[in-house]
Amino acid sequence: MPSYRLSHLKQLEAESIHIIREVAVEFENPVMLYSIGKDSSVMVRLAEKAFYPGKVPFPLLHVDSKWKFREMIEFRDSYARENNWGLIVHSNEEAFADGVGPFSHGSQVHTDLMKTQALLQALGKYKFDAAFGGARRDEEKSRAKERIFSFRDRFNQWDPKNQRPELWEIYNTKVHKGESIRVFPISNWTELDIWEYIRLEKIPIVPLYYAKERPVVRVEGNLIMVDDDRMPQEMRARAEMRVVRFRTLGCYPLTGAVESSASTIEEIVAEMMTTTKSERTTRVIDFDQEASMEQKKREGYF
């Protein structure tokens, strides 16, 4: 009798679907965080597969910092509309009204108020008890040591020294009143796995991932794209046209592009075969203080 073996990608897919279904069964009001990026797009496809042909039993939540690339917002709205997803968009309107932004207040204050606090507001407002996130262990060292089921106390804080064992894909989903959980179903995927799955499944993604001539300004070693006129004039005056693409997407003043000629999925996959740096090296928020990402996660960040 011939043996049946799953491919590497299909094994990862099966693990992720198992995790998504586990959360849907164990929690009363889960939500899937949707950042509009490649990892979120893969996670959404996995959720659709997990419950096909039925409807996915939880909504998408996008925490809008008001500083995302314009192409990201256009993609978000068209994708949710065309695929009939329930999409919740939440922003920290009070902080935005006060003029908080990355240019005026710096990356730390902007990220805390417009991303971390906005996320906590949304989780509290809609009383979500579990939130799926698209973080992967190969991205960054604090994420490398985080469990798939990452528990948060009643203050939404993460304690890396108080994590539960996850042996044999058996997950402890019990939480006390007021506690919640962040779940990362693609923790064991790599950036290359993500791109190969996008190619396999023909998943639509934001065009910013493809190389194209774009106006960029060099800021502390990062190529920051000029996306709107909120960028100070003195910075825009230094802009130059370069063929670049983005490996990761976030707020445009805090996300660096990389010089690349990869304009197709096949070329991106080939590029990933030889790259030696994490995509998070182009995210300013990961380096705005010592142990930056771990500290942000302790405070409630994704």
From Swiss-Prot:
E.C. no: 2.7.7.4
Substrates-to-products reaction catalysed: sulfate + ATP + H(+) = adenosine 5'-phosphosulfate + diphosphate
Coiled coil, from the record: none
Any one GO biological process: sulfate assimilation
Cited function: With CysN forms the ATP sulfurylase (ATPS) that catalyzes the adenylation of sulfate producing adenosine 5'-phosphosulfate (APS) and diphosphate, the first enzymatic step in sulfur assimilation pathway. APS synthesis involves the formation of a high-energy phosphoric-sulfuric acid anhydride bond driven by GTP hydrolysis by CysN coupled to ATP hydrolysis by CysD.
Subunit structure: Heterodimer composed of CysD, the smaller subunit, and CysN.
Protein name per its UniProtKB record: Sulfate adenylyltransferase subunit 2
